[in-house]
Swiss-Prot record:
Described purpose of this protein according to its UniProt entry: Probable regulator of exocrine pancreas development.
One GO cellular component, as annotated: mitochondrion
Location of the region described as Disordered in the Swiss-Prot/TrEMBL record: 22-47, 75-114
Protein name: Pancreatic progenitor cell differentiation and proliferation factor
InterPro entries documented for this protein: PPDPF
Bias-annotated ranges (Low complexity): 23-33
Phosphoserine modifications at: S9
Length: 114
């Protein structure tokens, strides 16, 4: 069984992306209040993520990202998908009899195979 990493390694990963490489602190286990590093400014044009809650929009349908709102809004006003003619041509129609593992059709009689 693989070992679960300690919370210290998660803090170190978090701090790596939040601080510049030339930070005065070399201790990766300290928190942001204990080791004030130089914060990386947020790039313009990118949406700001809500730390710890970015995944909630995928489960509850609320989106803070503009491109996700466009996709969700267009999906609400569109009609439900329907089977195309190519699916019917491939033998996936609902009326087609289903084959059982022995090569028999499900609509065949219960008698012995001939």
């Amino acid at each position: 069984m693989a070992a679960i990493p300690s919370s210290g390694s998660l803090v170190a990963t978090h701090d790596y992306y939040r601080r510049r490489l030339g930070s005065t602190s070399s201790n990766s286990s300290c928190s942001s209040t204990e080791c004030p590093g130089e914060a990386i400014p947020h790039p313009p044009g990118l949406p700001k993520a809500d730390p710890g809650h970015w995944w909630a929009s995928f489960f509850f349908g609320k989106s803070t990202l503009p491109f996700m709102a466009t996709v969700l809004e267009s999906a609400e006003h569109s009609e439900p998908p329907q089977a195309s003619s190519s699916m019917t041509a491939c033998g996936l129609a609902r009326d087609a009899p289903r084959k059982q593992p022995g090569g028999q059709s499900s609509t065949a009689s219960a008698g012995p195979p001939s």
